[in-house]
């Protein structure tokens, strides 16, 4: 946790320096949890976005300013942060990091005509009925479908169990499309167990999977409950393949967690830090030098999000003098015309705000994420 707080402070200090730039910069507001239980996500987003801002400004031409606000993954605090950013002069938002705050802020931004691009809020509800909210991340339905396809195409299991949070929109959204696609593909789902946000004992869920003979357990959940499930399975001597989605990214950074229990865990993610292409190597190197640690896919999505906003602004002719409302309409049109070659793939968007790109499968090996291919 101390490392997370240090990274958050470093991010804010870097952003403060960025905000001291001269007039003439397009102002981008960013909202996410820099403190609290979800700080792993929010700090990574702030850091990745800042690297992109620095690169864009270093190349000359149109300049950009980033102002990151902490919402502690709380919807009410997120709306307050949004209003603070409008008072600051934000012309568009890279926001928010988590789903429930994004839905709340998105509703307000729709009324105000402020363009929002979320790096990581993946629920379909984020963009529903809002023409001004776009996503860099995969949607929950897309993650569920892609996971079932990957498990089937790679013959990872003969029997599959699922453990998901039925009180969480992210988890439920992924499960629903996974279940539908698994049935279509003929995957044998032998056990489905649920839990809620306050669950700390997963013995019932793990026992159900074990007794059903599942050789793969699909976990469309966040990393904190996933770590508890891995500990419970280890206690019971149960060692199937555990398979998750982007919410699993961060499990290796949990303070006090025995990361050896995550060995062999697989997940679909848009980003693999061990990739050797020039863009990824450069990003990982800069991230390690500036913030320490290996960047996760949240950092990569944020980095790509800033570049997408810059590409849309350039395409549409947005400047520092463009009003918030005009910038919103101009960027909406441009987002449907641009193509961004990012860390997380080649990205295009349609009028629904959803992104099209291809996920990557990674596996934890020797305490690090590596490509599963």
Predicted regions and their residues:
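Sec-dependent signal peptide recognition
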Residues: 2-10, 14
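Extracytosolic ligand-binding ectodomains
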Residues: 4-7, 22-373
């Amino acid at each position: 946790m101390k490392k997370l707080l240090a990274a958050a402070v470093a991010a804010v200090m870097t952003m403060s320096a960025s905000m001291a730039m001269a007039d003439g910069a397009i102002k981008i507001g960013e909202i996410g949890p820099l403190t609290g239980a979800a700080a792993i996500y929010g700090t990574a987003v702030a850091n990745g976005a800042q690297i992109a801002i620095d690169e864009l400004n270093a190349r000359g031409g149109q300049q950009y300013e980033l102002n990151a606000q902490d919402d502690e993954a709380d919807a009410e605090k997120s709306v307050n942060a949004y209003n603070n950013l409008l008072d600051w002069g934000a012309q568009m938002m890279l926001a928010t990091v988590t789903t429930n705050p994004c839905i709340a802020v998105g509703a307000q931004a729709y009324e105000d005509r402020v363009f929002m691009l979320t790096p990581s809020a993946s629920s379909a509800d984020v963009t529903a009925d809002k023409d001004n909210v776009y996503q860099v991340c995969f949607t929950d339905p897309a993650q569920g479908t892609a996971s079932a396809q990957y498990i089937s195409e790679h013959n990872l299991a003969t029997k599959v169990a699922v453990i998901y949070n039925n009180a969480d929109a992210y988890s439920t959204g992924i499960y629903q499309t996974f279940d539908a696609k698994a049935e279509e593909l003929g995957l044998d789902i032998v056990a489905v167990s649920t839990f809620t946000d306050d669950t700390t004992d997963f013995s019932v869920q793990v026992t159900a999977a074990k007794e059903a003979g599942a050789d793969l357990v699909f976990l469309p959940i966040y990393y904190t409950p996933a770590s508890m499930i891995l500990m419970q399975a280890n206690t019971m001597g149960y060692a199937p393949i555990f398979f998750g989605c982007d919410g699993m990214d961060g499990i290796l950074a949990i303070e006090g967690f025995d990361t050896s229990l995550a060995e062999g865990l697989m997940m679909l993610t848009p980003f693999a830090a061990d990739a050797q292409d020039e863009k990824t190597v450069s990003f990982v190197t800069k991230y390690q030098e500036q913030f320490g640690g290996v960047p996760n896919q949240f950092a990569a999505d944020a980095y790509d999000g800033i570049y997408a906003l810059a590409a849309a602004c350039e395409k549409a002719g947005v400047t520092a003098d463009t009003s918030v409302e005009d910038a919103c309409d101009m960027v909406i049109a441009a987002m449907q015309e641009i193509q961004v070659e990012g860390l997380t793939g080649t990205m295009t968007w349609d009028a629904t705000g959803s992104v099209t790109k291809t996920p990557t499968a990674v596996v934890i090996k020797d305490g690090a994420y590596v490509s599963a291919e």
